[in-house]
Amino acid sequence: MSQRQFKVIIIGGSVTGLTLAHSLHKIGIDYVVLEKRDTVTPQEGASIGILPNGARILDQLGLYEAIEDEAPPLGATRIHFPDGFAFTSLYPKRMRHSFGYPIAFLERRQLLRILYDALPDKTRIHVNKTMSTIEHFTKDEITGARVLTKEGDVYEGDLIVGADGIHSQTRGEIWRRINSSKSAFKTAEEYSCCFGISKCVTGLIAGEQVMHMRNGRTLVVIPSKDEVVFWFLVEKLDRKYTYSEAPRFTIDDATALCSQVFTLPIGNNIKFEDVWNKREVVNMLSLEESCLSTWSTGRLVCIGDSIHKMTVNLGQGANCAIEDVAVLCNLLRNMCQLKSGTRPTEQEIDLLLRRFNKQHLSRVTQITNMSKLTVRVHARKGVLHRLVGRYVMPYFGAYFEARPFNMLADAASLDFIPLPKSSYPGWEKYSSKTRGNSRLLPLMFTLPLLYFGLSWIVGIYWKPGYLHAWNS
């Protein structure tokens, strides 16, 4: 068999795709990135949060210092409720002290620029290349896969990775090959999100986030450096939609929604209307919630938003995708080392991708489920979520934050690069290897805590007519 170097074709110049490019470079695997737009740094009005699980991998790749320069760390969150109660959560500060990395928000375009600028060979990035067809081929005793673009170009390689987002063409090709259908894409769209970036907003403190948890909606405002403010407003839709029937929104829809929260205070005598009036870019879309169980077939695999999609509240969408990259690259590196320069067969690649799917699915499912819970607590969906948000979080928040800390501590990383900041206590303290895998013990403590906590709440706050006022 020919000794031609193993090559990966990456569909999509996304955060996921560019992170994969950096990781492949580290292990000496040839690659090419195909992006359908005319730039890999488009302005979409979106911010992105980098949390410790994603930050650690980016730090391994030598990319995190540039992110730190752009994004002031979150130190606290001021959380407001409909009844006028508010409290300050130091969850972001405790996260940084535990894991060494803060919650850092920056423009998605800024992160894409950082990833692109740091690439050692930008000639591997091809814009204006829209995938048209994927074929398997045999040529001169060499087998592989090729991508044909609508522009008439042909790219050949051994593995095709779809990092092309929620509307993934690569995923569609996988479905076609396994005789599946779009009905298998069991995404639910129960919430919408209007998000934007405002500039020249004076009077707010960088790194002090503000959240309003209302009935059916959540407003989050994140002041950053240089008087830039990131914000998003999540709204519960009138019903649950499927992927194909989800509503589309206009700027008029965004304006109408945001006008309903103009009077909400952000701090220092600033209302949300003041932030809205300084907007630079605004967008609105429905939020998908999904986690596919099948990610690959043959020489094709999907990662990132093309296989798992979450709402913005937990901030794990990009971070989970970065973990996808780490798990896949660890397996690819091991395979290439075992082959000692001989290109793997299609059967060997297919087996590796199935192993990737099986190994990482439970982790992705865990994060997706936590994201689903978070958006519903923030939007106060139903009595239980309202009780947790209003009466458990303010008083027992430090106890219940152990669950997301457990999730962070069990994050994947690149196993061939030393771990930075591994001396921070949270990575070991909250790891499943340290705490064990038993779910019974946490439950034994959690249920009594909820019982006595809710009994205390009812005893203090219950009075005739109170429940009606609380639900309004």
Curated annotation (Swiss-Prot):
Family from the record: Belongs to the paxM FAD-dependent monooxygenase family.
Keywords: FAD, Flavoprotein, Glycoprotein, Membrane, Monooxygenase, Oxidoreductase, Signal, Transmembrane, Transmembrane helix
Annotated binding of FAD, by residue: 35, 49, 108, 305, 318
Predominant location: membrane
Residue stretches spanning the membrane: 440-460
Enzyme Commission number(s) of this protein: 1.-.-.-
Glycosylation sites: 128, 179, 369
Protein name: FAD-dependent monooxygenase dpmaE
GO terms assigned for molecular function: FAD binding; monooxygenase activity
Cofactor needs: FAD
Membrane topology: Single-pass membrane protein
UniProt keyword tRNA-binding, yes or no: no
Organism: Metarhizium anisopliae
